[in-house]
Curated annotation (Swiss-Prot):
The lineage of its organism: Eukaryota, Metazoa, Ecdysozoa, Nematoda, Chromadorea. Gene3D superfamilies: Cyclic phosphodiesterase. It comes from Caenorhabditis elegans. The keyword Secreted applies. This is Uncharacterized protein C35A5.6. GO terms for cellular component: extracellular region.
Length: 239
């Protein structure tokens, strides 16, 4: 093969690789009481430890990350179609996703996150698995790096530099890290993983709905009846 031909093929391949980018599905947590509690957690942490100011998450964009995928210009129409069909495919898993929190926790001494209760964790994990299964039937590759999915809402994420012991701070000041409320979420949003401005650029969203909204599934019995539960009162203490 002539050198010029090989060079052209290499440049075409390089261009294809460079145009790929990651995107992630997420459920946005916008309940005012949750936002207020997270804001207080961040204030309590940063007032005593100013070094953490640049690592706290913007309370306007609190979210629980689901699946991560690899996109490009060719796959963009495919994922838009995927989002359009997602509510119908998801309705027998959950059309109202509970994000009910029972405190905060620290992971690897670098990430402070809101911990969802067991019921929420089970439903969100089912949603994650359903999206993963649906993606397997498309040309959109999943690039999730975790073997076991653990849903969480990150509040503070530190970099690799040396910082004060986040776990020790939290252990000594447990009253400063209370999070005991939640919400039911009815949208799944897809974002470009590359940050843009104050957050990430939205690619699209899927508004969830019960199966009765879709003619073909009108008489299909939901698989997870236990997902349809009332929200807990906001003042309830999850410990």
């Amino acid at each position: 093969m002539p050198l010029l031909h090989r060079t052209i093929i290499f440049l075409q391949l390089l261009g294809t690789i460079s145009s790929n980018y990651n995107a992630f599905f997420a459920i946005m947590v916008t309940n005012p009481t949750v936002v207020q509690q997270v804001n207080q957690i961040e204030v309590n942490l940063t007032q005593s430890n100013p070094q953490f100011v640049k690592f706290v998450h913007n309370i306007s964009h609190l979210h629980i990350k689901l699946n991560t995928v690899e996109l490009n210009e060719t796959r963009l129409p495919i994922v838009q179609k995927f989002l359009k069909e997602l509510p119908k495919a998801m309705c027998n898993v959950s059309y109202s996703i509970p994000a009910l929190f029972e405190g905060t926790a620290v992971m690897a001494n670098t990430t402070l996150y809101g911990k969802v209760n067991p019921m929420s964790s089970s439903v969100i994990s089912s949603v994650h698995q359903k999206i993963f299964s649906l993606l397997n039937n498309t040309e959109i590759p999943s690039v999730d790096v975790h073997d076991i999915f653990h849903p969480r809402m990150n509040i503070v994420e530190l970099d690799n530099r040396k910082h004060e012991d986040l776990l020790q701070i939290m252990s000594n000041r447990t009253g400063d890290f209370k999070l005991n409320t939640g919400d039911f979420i009815k949208e799944i949003v897809l974002f470009n993983s590359t940050e843009s401005g104050s957050f990430h650029e939205e690619i699209g969203r899927a508004v969830l709905a019960p199966c009765s909204n879709f003619t073909l599934l009108r008489f299909k019995k939901p698989e997870l009846i236990s997902n349809r539960v009332p929200i807990f009162p906001l003042e309830m203490d999850f410990k």
